Amino acid sequence: MDGEELTEQETALYDRQIRVWGADAQRRLSKAHILVCGINGTTAEFCKNIVLAGVGSLTLVDDRVATEEALSANFLIPSDESVYGGKTLTELCRDSLKDFNPMVRVSVEKGDLSNFGGEFYSKFDVVVISCCSLSTKQKLEETIECQHNYPSFEESISVPWKALPRKMSKLYFAMRVIERFEDAEQRKPGEVSIADLPGVLKLKNEFCEAQSLKESHIPDALLERLVTDPREFPPVCPIIGGILGQEVIKAISGKGEPLKNFFFFDAMDGKGIIEDLSNNTGS
């Protein structure tokens, strides 16, 4: 990302934010290449934020065809079925994002994540993953070369539950259970319903026994709430997408340390919590 200076056009367009974080940070952003795999309401908000911030390029991967259900959370999809009918989520989002900032190159890459090798991912400075299974995330982490001082995803989720802080967000434990259930049942993220609750509760009990925790450590009511309606809650998407955009901008620009290393937001109480999951986690 080092090398070229900002053009006169870039300097004029990004004048306000240059005053906030400086020309060097903006130059780093303008040379950054971002990959987003998996389009939903949250990543749509993220894409909007980094396109407005002025990254060099944004590549989208998601071959799913747009549906009426996707409209509720993804504001980048036109509401007219004659426009979105038969098109993929990435095609529609690409067209909308180009209008936000014509100076950012927005493109679509077709294909399945599992078919892309390390050479493909090496073209990008930041890779954002959403809408994929636990096993897919773990495989991608093995494929993508990273430069970081933070624990890897695999290291973080491997920390024994007994070693985590006593006030650790219950959302973390509940999400781990549901994610494992989806993986075991070969479901895509969000493909759970209230009919799956008995199986989810059974897996929770097995988890708690294996981790030497009481079954009450993960409230049944929380799991029931999460499987009853696993769809995105539209008002939350701008919040999470905004925070994700902020952290990626930090990582690229060097202006501030990205949060370490998990962020949880509970729409029920409107609170966001940062949790540090690493082998150095204390109780």
Ranges and model annotations:
Residues 1-283:
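Adenine nucleotide-associated cytosolic modules
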